[in-house]
């Protein structure tokens, strides 16, 4: 499939338990190492660069049973995992990401309880988890920088997912401020420490004040020590951006009273208007200007770092004539070009999610994002190219968005 569309790289992730079945590096599963070596070598043999994410949400159960990502011990376990990855694959892998989507790991997993490990601890768990994941990322980056970069000469980043938040009313100062607050509290929460060394000042003050009102003697948002500020600051060679959709924002609290939560801390609500094109996912409406907007926002707030779009995609229910996906890809790539050429955003690459239909977390096999259709009822899991795969191939081959391209006519 990758050869058919002439893809230059392939983004894969490592399964922690496939490599370290007990969580730590006391037991290394050679079969797991061999599996990834074979995959990496086959990609390179076909002139496809492997792009490897170390952690994509699959924490070994034995480590979850000790508390998971709200425990400091997880940082050292992750470093063991990262070291094994760098040692075994780093001679050939030149592009790494430490984590995929801290928001889904932490806020969804340890605060809202909507993703594994399904812990509900609103307004606390997500912050505790994020703090440790950021420290784990930073230590892994420093380890690579000091021990592996001199001989392997690769790059290390992290993927942060975000909506772009537009003001509900572009002429309303209140709504414009709400959109900015939403970006600070939802994207800046993760990016600010990596870029500048600490959480956004607005976020620190906001959560501290709300914590005092709640009768607490300290903020629900953990603090970085001065040493940790220096540790975390600048731990990127590029920023990975996962972006699918956007919303229109305005100031309003959640509907759960004064109970602590991240959304109460944010104090902003958002919605997606009906005129935005619909996908098969309730959260994903089509608004290409949002991708351009978040790229510009990153440039203006963080000094125009290299940004690799690591996920961007469209879901439908089934079928091979996926014109909705084609429109999405073309429109979002055009918005990316506008960000590059009109606003000088430092975009270094684009990754479509996903190559083929897959298991989409809580929605299982019911929503399809792939360029290739997978027959999940066939024991062979037959793959069939969708119309979008041919359009995407044409874009790769020509480096041009041909709005009139029709595969059936070529």
Per-region residue spans from a language model:
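N-terminal structural segment of carbohydrate-active enzymes
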Residues: 1-29, 33, 39-42
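Active-site region of glycoside hydrolase catalytic domains
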Residues: 22-24, 33-410
